[in-house]
Amino acid sequence: MSRGWQWLVRICAGLSVLGALHAVVNTALLRRPPALPGPVGRRVTVVLPVRDEADQVADCLAAVLDQRGAGDLRVVVVDDGSTDGTAERVAAVADDRVTLLRAVPPPPGWLGKPSACAQGAAAATDAEVLVFLDADVRLMPDAIASAVAVLDDAGLDLVSPWPRQLTGSAAERLVQPLQQWLWATLLPLRLAERSPRPSLAAANGQFLVVRRSAYDRAGGHGAVRGQVIEDVALLRAVKAAGGRGVVVDGSTLAACRMYDGWTGVRDGYAKSLWSALGGRPAAAVGAAAGLSAVWLLPPLAALTGSRAGLA
């Protein structure tokens, strides 16, 4: 093995070890919600954008409506052109806390989800806290009260409780943990929480909790109207407007099965990662090469008998 190759393997192995150590530190510093939160003393509105979620929306709504200590809770379901009977499932829910809103088509320059979220937020005229939720998320009974408690106790403007990710196939079990691993290894959470730099941000749009005042100050979803990864973009907009926010441990608050098998994983990540890399082929190749070098090269070198691969 050439000396240059050995040095490359050593450097990549060292970076891999540093990333793992940083993930351990981040995991220890990750904010965790209280097990027994106090009641929320203000109006909370859950905005639930849906499109063809007939199989999910009833269970999602049931979990939202069963929240404990969530204050004056309201739910705005924004049906974004469903054709599978989603709206009818929502209309059948006999609870006056639920409002069904038929979304108007996105204006030019807007994507569907930001537009639906913006319409839901606009309908929540007296909300002091907004919760944006995906239909495939199942909340635990104290989820909203616990998330708001983190928001208040840490003096934050936005928190993104990362739900426990459920998997049902080998592809999901292999790929889904990489989302958390990326921000755990690369993003210094406590620095990101304090820093005004928008680039230091991680969020998960499955479950977002934001103060209405901070949301409006940031321009709401209008500020991220054309963003595929609108969750991270919204946190960046909040930070750019002077707010503070961070991802927090949501594994005890919510659960979500994001994709159903390899096809969903492939299509979903192809869309989101391509957008994250700016739609540039060179950036995609560079990112894949860099991540593969750091995380795959050292163990492969070790398997072929290289002591350098063992760092």
What are these regions (language model features)?
Residues 1-40, 176-180, 185-189:
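N-terminal membrane-anchoring/stem segments of glycan-assembly enzymes
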Residues 23-26, 102-120, 150-217:
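Long helical/loop segments within the catalytic core of UDP-sugar-dependent glycosyltransferases
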Residues 27, 283-311:
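Membrane-embedded multi-pass helical conduit in multi-pass membrane proteins
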Residues 42-45, 74:
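Cell-envelope/extracellular polymer assembly enzymes that use nucleotide-activated donors
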Residues 55-59, 84-93, 102, 142:
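Acidic helix N-cap motif at the loop->helix transition within catalytic regions
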Residues 62-72:
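Short, acidic, metal-binding catalytic loop of nucleotide-sugar glycosyltransferases
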Residues 85, 134-150:
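Acidic donor-binding/catalytic loop of UDP-sugar-dependent glycosyltransferases
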Residues 151, 160-183, 213-216, 221-283:
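Catalytic donor/gating beta->alpha subdomain of glycosyltransferases that bind UDP-sugars
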